[in-house]
Each structure stands twice: as structure tokens, then as C-alpha cells.
Amino acid sequence: GAVDSKGNEINRNRLVAVAAAIALEGNDGGMIVTDSITSSGLKQFIENDLGGKHYRYRRGYKNVIDKALELNAQGINCPLAIETSGHAAMRENYFLDDGAYLCTKIIIKAAQMRKEGKELDELTASLKEPLESTEIRYKILEKDFRACGEKIIADLTKYAEEQDGWCVADDNREGVRVSFDRDNGDGWFLLRLSVHDPIMPLNVESDSEGGVK
């Protein structure tokens, strides 16, 4: 990550937003591949403000890079694969997982904007960020933790589909992601199974005070 002129950290969703804004210059309508826990505000920023497309995929930097390579091979303009953890790979840099390259791109962009009398934070001024967010990690005690986790996700998906004010995301590709209307938390959660460990991380975000609870 980095820090802008106001002392705000450029990390997680904000880092993805900055990288996407840079990557989409000269790539109008391009596809940005991210991991699964990116915010709803980031999707809106990429698609509505930048005019790009957002492909929310799975956790793991190799997963997002491989998906970007696959999309490009299919003829889809995909200039960037990035995780909220900061792992980033750009097509112009042969999709190498290269944090130094991204940092250099950000520094160059900041210098260009400074010459225009602007600051880097203006690049993502319209990014809507959640009021509250948290992550809870549930440990699975069953011996066959993968089968257990997959059953929990399947049961939760079915339950969510039956609830008023809940909406199961149709563009999610890992675990189950559910959005909630203003009367039911005003946000979303994602429950997924860890790639290697008997853990089920639950990521929750809300745009209202007390919404996470």
C-alpha cells in the first residue's frame, strides 16, 4: 500500500481502485479481475465511474492472475489482476506479481497529477467505502472440513434465497455472497472456505451504523 497527501492509507479496496483507474487508461471498457472480498462500492466505481468491467473471482493471487490470462486468451481486454491483499499483476508487465511495478505506476500517476495541480486521492474521490466492516474466521472441527464447509455454504445459500431483503449475488464465484437492503443491514457478507485450512472466513460490510451487527 501507500499513503496519500491527506494521510489516508491506499490499501485494500482503495488500492484496487487506484490500480484499476491507472490500468484502464487506454483500455476503455477493460475487465478488472479481483478476488472475492472486494466491496460493492469498488464494483460501482470500476463499472460506473471508470467505465470498466469488474470480474470478482476467488482469493489467491495465482487464481486472479490465471483468470486474467484466460480472459485475455479469449479476446477479452483485461489489463489488470489484483487482490485486496495488494498482490497485483498488469498485462503490460507480462502479468508478473510485481508490487514494485505497481508502486512505480502509482508514483508516476501522482507526479502527473501534481503537475496538473491535482492530488492522487482525487483519482478515487467517488469510491464509496463502507461505514463498517469486519472479518470473522470460523474454525471447522470436522475431519473432512472441505465437505463440511461446502455443505454449510449450500445450506446458507438456500436459506438466504428464502429471506426477504436478502439477495444472493449472481456474480460471485467463491462461497456465498449475500446483499442486504437497508432494513436488513444495508450491506453484504461473503462466507467462503479457506483454500488450504479448515477455516471459513466471513467478511461483512455495511453502509449503516450498526449494520454489521
Name the predicted role of every residue range.
Residues 1-15, 43:
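Short Gly/Thr/Asp-enriched flexible loops that form oxyanion-binding sites at enzyme active sites
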Residues 6, 26-203, 208-213:
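Phosphate-binding and adjacent anionic-ligand microenvironments
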Residues 13-19, 103:
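Alpha-helical metal-binding/catalytic segments enriched in His/Glu/Asp
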Residues 20-26:
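Short, basic/hydrophobic alpha-helical segments
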